[in-house]
Amino acid sequence: MTMKLNYKRVLLVGMAFFLISAFWQAYDAITPLILTNHFGLPQSVSGTIMSFDNILAVFMLPVFGALSDRVNTRYGKRTPFIFFGTIAAVIAFVCLTFIDNYQLSLLAAEGIPSLTAGTMSEEAFSLFVRETTLALTLKNPLPLIGFIATLLLVLISMATFRSPAVALMPDVTVKPLRSKANAIINLTGTAGGIIVLVLGMVFATSKKQYMHYTGYVLAVCGVMLFGFVLFLLTVREKKWAAEMEADTEKYGLGSSSDSKAADGGVKLSRPEMRSLLLILASVALWYVGYNSITSKYSVYATNILGFDFNFTLIIAQAAAIVSYIPVGIVASKIGRKKTILSGIVILASAFTAGFFVTPDTPELIMYPVFALAGIGWATINVNSFPMVVELARHGDTGKYTGYYYTASMSAQIVAPILSGFLYDSLGMRYVFFTFGALFVALSFLTMFFVKHGNSEVIEKKSALEQLDVD
């Protein structure tokens, strides 16, 4: 009897990741622009504030992942966290824009949006405006304080349900099918990101330096609530988790007795622990490289290249969407480790190519660069999380999800702070892609020595069975 992935079920579970990805796409796009353009903060300070979500995540994601392992309600273990966290995040996100609007009114009262370059160079004028804006912020810091306080509420709300949302896929999917399932999860997440990027083009978020973002954020929250409602109406967490346990027993893949691992009854062997640590180190390294690009690309494209960052990122997301399912299939044939190593090479090559794109280069040259980056990131991302939870026993999936996010979020604390400092010290033009490519390349070394985390290869009897889904 052949194991079959229920694509529809995984797609519906992925609605939680859909709304999470929609939020982060908007957050990463507009928050650095608000901090640098509306408050006049230097890149190093902006990068530090942008790392707040990762600092919170290092502590909160493992806690809420492990907590959701132990919760048992009529709606399941993960759904209650998704319910309350989403509602709180949406409300706080909208409130954030009201504070930004107040700051913009203060800038308008001082005539800052009406300033023109005159005989000044574009670079000198940009520096003059930023310093003038920063002086106004320091004179009246209350809007910035209120903005950061509300931002923390948004980030705390998101952190309460990210691990539970991601842990839900392994809860309802047997181990050998998790790379394919994770491809679908990433597909839904990328779809959420692309929708938000299209909204960014509609609202022209890359064109207006002193834009009011309330309308844009309301539209983004509408996308989030669409995924949220669809998730609540269709996902039956307890029923589907019970069916997964039955399938696990039926195919001899382990048993629910593995749940004693959550209480320390079963520990990883020394080689397994070594592989886990190497996987987590790899995750940290490639996230430092990747996040240094994604968290500041809106600033780099707008201020250095003069490009529309929204469409470039859509190209990357579209390439990733095309790649997710084939990558999951490839991993089931040649193994997750080999697939990830190839993805690292692709991503590092893309970032290296990006270094050679200058303000004088036609914008369309950046499109294949980011398409390649999207393919590389999809190849890595589809397989890295399943490698971590492959080492988990049934009862501690949430805890291992927390380990994964501790590694990735710790890296994303370092990335914006370190890269921001280097941008301020050495200039963004020459450091931006170099920094990203270097750290992605380093992850190849740690991943090369991983020995555990691959799934059993699934072989189907015929070509027709390769298309067999529920």
Give the ranges of each region predicted by the language model.
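A membrane-interface helix-boundary motif in multi-pass transporters
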Residues: K77-T79, A204-G222, F421-F439
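C-terminal ends and interior cores of transmembrane alpha-helices
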Residues: F83-N140, I346-D360
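Helix-to-loop junctions at the C-terminal end of transmembrane segments
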Residues: F59-Y75, S323-R336, Y423
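Intracellular juxtamembrane helix-capping segments at the cytosolic ends
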Residues: T160-T173, T379-R393
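Helix-loop boundary and gating motifs at the non-cytosolic
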Residues: T2-N54, L277-S282, W286-L305, T312
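Intracellular loop-helix junctions on the cytosolic face of multi-pass helical membrane proteins
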Residues: M1-N6, L127-T150, S157-L168, V172-I293, ...
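C-terminal transmembrane helical hairpin of 12-TM major facilitator-type secondary transporters
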Residues: K338-N381
